[in-house]
Amino acid sequence: MFNKTITTLSVLLCTLMAAGQSLPITKSVGGLETKVWKSPAKVGSQTLPTSVDNSTSIHFPPIFNQIGGSCAQASSIGYVFTYEMNALLDRDASIPENRFSYLYAWNLINDGADEGSFQYQGLQIASSNGIMTEADFPEQTSALYFKWASGFEKYLNAIKYKAETFVNIEITDSASLYKVKEYLYNKGEAGKKGGVLGFSSQATGWKFNTSYSGPSETGYKCVLTKLAYDGGHAMTIVGYDDLIEFERPDGKISKGAFIAVNSYGTDYWYHDNGRFYLPYWFFISEHDSGQLSNDLLGVIPKYVEHPQIVFKVGLDYTSRNDLMFRYGISNNLNASSPEHNYKFPIFDNQGGDFNMQGRGAQTHLEFAMDFSQYASRTGETPIWYLTVERTQKGSKLGEGIMRIFEVYDYRKNPENPVIYKHKDINGKTIELGTNVFEISSVEPPQTSFSTIEWLNKSKQPIASPYVFRTADGKYAKVRFSEYDRENGTIKIKYVYAPDGSTNIE
């Protein structure tokens, strides 16, 4: 179940998260702002309870058994993001409509293979385009389909549920241990809900006491007694119990443990209903960071009732990792290229050599791209741009066509957006290289005209000139001559009056 590739991912994640501690306030990891969490309460001003267990909250989802090597997303999205979003919205996580799909995130970042990932990668997706609920992206029975969801409304719903940022807490001593417990209890604000935190460790060769009967306020029977030596894994800390007693290797007794939740289901023999006690001692004693990361990861969620600007895209394609998307605008209606152009952070040469919806699935995909973060740069009458880059990335070069490109502008009326449509995109081939599609928010001016007879009975141009009114309201004089019907050529002479005068010589 575990392998050295995942171990490397875990160690790299630990390194990245630890690097974030060198800055006292913020750190950008993978393009997502990370905050070193600081309690709003005065240091030591709170009396913490003896125990906290947020896994018993209605906001925490039922324990589940992860699919494949998806542990990082199972923790960061399936548990942490789900709990925090439901705590924010005061919702019950027992129903699929309120649980967030870790597989939706994992399938976007695993390159079409059963491989591990970083916790922040799923949160980066949550930050940019939101996370689907399990109602829109149901649980899978196999890790090998690598499914992508299709449907504009599903993606539009996902855009409501975002990660604003995520937080780091590093455990190094008793003071930072108190800080973690405070976060779990009420995040430093009296009367507020506590949080949960993701962490990484190894998980091959660990040892447990599965019949713990010592002091406890929370009542679980499983205590970790020895750290693992291989196989990186991600899990979630949901609470603590200060009464737990743990016999250290030197025979001394240490008190207190975190409550950890795993994603191996409720019947995993080393745990108690999917949970185990993780003694504080392991964090504050000397150990290898690959065995257990001292850095814990939390999420600050954001609910967006209505987006501002959303692109709707539909296409058929047979090897999805060939494709990369950009979306942009120009506020100059005479522009021939985007003034502002941004790389879309998902569907970015990802997903492996499969059809758009996954292995053995349909080639068609319809999705939404949230442009709201760039709305402040968008004027009232822009040109909208969609760029599709097609390059061979895997073992085969796919092929396909565009179906839909539309822009939904919710800025004036969130309930009734203005919809701009590309009217002739359906069926256009996605060529190798750069494919640019544009929609003007202003209809081109309409020009009316009357038919004229410009050939005489001999089928030659009439010698006299004609005066036309041009599309800009000015005038031009035109004469036709030297018409060659067989070769399809004609000579045209014209004089344009830029001052609008009809006095044309």
Where are these regions (language model features)?
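N-terminal signal peptide c-region/cleavage motif recognized by signal peptidases
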Residues: 14-15, 19
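Alpha-helical support elements that line or immediately flank enzyme active sites
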Residues: 64-89
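Surface-exposed, beta-sheet-biased, low-hydrophobicity segments with strongly acidic/polar composition
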Residues: 439-505
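A short glycine/serine-rich beta->alpha loop
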Residues: 57-68, 109-113
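Sec-dependent signal peptide recognition
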Residues: 2-11
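Acidic helix-start/capping segments at beta-turn-to-alpha-helix junctions
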Residues: 92-111, 143-144
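Predominantly the structural core of cysteine protease catalytic domains
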Residues: 73, 77-81, 108-257, 261, ...
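N-terminal zymogen propeptides
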Residues: 20-55, 310, 403-409, 424, ...
